[in-house]
């Protein structure tokens, strides 16, 4: 996080929320671009710096976006910066545009679509395989994109490790909104630096009122996160299972409370007790179910 920008945010903070109109006026962000018409997501620019404002209709989701940013930091997962904000009509989240000059950005969806188009008509089952979005076929799609580079094996290994880390984080936080459109791969123009961009759109985490969209290797309309975890445990390599177990053990209630404290420090105020209580309740409910799945898996191992 840019400390100078954080200082500017805090100067415009009122009751934990940043007054967006005041911030834009004082810091001369006078260029605006509408990113999503339906949700009124806008990006504001000052020179080469951009901030994005996303209105939220649900107060819980507004707070969770910031809490998940702080939780991801504690787990050493690269996440876009989020804060609380409001304008004349709405409350919402402010984030900083992580895009830089001399870099290209591709959604995982773009890469999978290119892979499907390339192989269409050559393999009879390829479209069905690709649309399951399982880890094996994502590996194939990445191979199809990068195999011509000398260090393609290193690149693909790095990307797959990052993807599994994000996947485990989403499982543990019940993120209902991760999909191939908001998983972004960033490439330097000379292709010496290729990785996943910081994760974003985490407002539906630890939320049992939403239907999961995280359909990796399953039909999301028929399965839940716990079925997804069971399939992951039974079909993944030991290396990836170890990643999940390490994150599961690290993400305990004390870490969630640390993320809440970090959020309160960031916004210079206290989170509503109702929000904290709901978060902690959802954490324990989720933890208990995951514990059952892991125990069943251990029994199968024996």
Whereabouts are the PLM-identified features?
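Regulatory N- and C-terminal appendages and interdomain linkers associated
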Residues: 1-33, 153-158, 188-191, 270-302
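Conserved ATP-binding subdomain of kinase catalytic cores across diverse folds
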Residues: 3-126
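A short, terminal or domain-edge coil/loop segment
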Residues: 28-36, 132-148, 211, 229-238
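Generic structural hydrophobic/aromatic packing signal, biased to beta-strands
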Residues: 45-47, 53, 82, 95, ...
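Conserved kinase catalytic-core segment
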Residues: 60, 134-211
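C-terminal catalytic region of ATP-dependent kinase domains
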Residues: 73, 189-302
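Short alpha-helical "patches" and their helix-cap loops
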Residues: 80-88, 179-189, 299
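ATP-dependent phospho-/nucleotidyl transfer catalytic cores
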Residues: 99-168, 278, 289, 298
């Amino acid at each position: 996080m840019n400390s100078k920008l954080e200082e500017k945010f805090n100067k415009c903070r009122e009751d934990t929320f940043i007054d967006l109109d005041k911030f834009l006026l004082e810091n001369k962000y006078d260029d605006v671009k509408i990113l999503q018409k339906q949700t009124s997501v806008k990006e504001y620019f000052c020179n080469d710096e951009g901030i994005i404002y996303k209105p939220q209709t649900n107060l819980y989701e507004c707070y969770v976006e910031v809490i998940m940013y702080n939780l991801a930091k504690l787990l050493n997962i690269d996440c876009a910066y989020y804060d609380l904000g409001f304008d004349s009509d709405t409350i919402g989240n402010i984030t900083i545009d992580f895009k830089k000059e001399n870099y290209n950005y591709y959604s995982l969806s773009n890469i999978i679509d290119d892979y499907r188009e390339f192989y269409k008509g050559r393999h009879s089952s390829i479209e069905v395989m690709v649309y399951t979005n399982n880890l094996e076929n994502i590996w194939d799609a990445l191979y199809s994109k990068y195999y011509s580079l000398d260090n393609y094996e290193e690149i693909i290994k790095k990307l797959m490790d990052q993807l599994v880390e994000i996947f485990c984080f989403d499982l543990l936080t019940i993120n209902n909104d991760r999909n191939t459109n908001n998983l972004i791969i960033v490439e330097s123009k000379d292709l010496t630096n290729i990785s996943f961009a910081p994760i974003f759109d985490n407002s539906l985490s630890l939320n049992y009122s939403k239907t999961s969209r995280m359909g990796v290797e399953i039909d999301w309309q028929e399965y839940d996160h716990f079925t997804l975890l069971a399939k992951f445990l039974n079909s993944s390599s030991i290396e990836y299972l170890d990643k999940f177990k390490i994150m599961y053990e690290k993400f305990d209630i004390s870490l969630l409370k640390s993320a809440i404290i970090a959020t309160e420090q960031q916004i210079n105020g206290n989170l509503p007790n109702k929000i904290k209580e709901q978060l902690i309740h959802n954490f324990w409910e989720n933890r208990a179910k995951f514990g059952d799945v892991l125990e069943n898996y251990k029994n199968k191992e024996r």
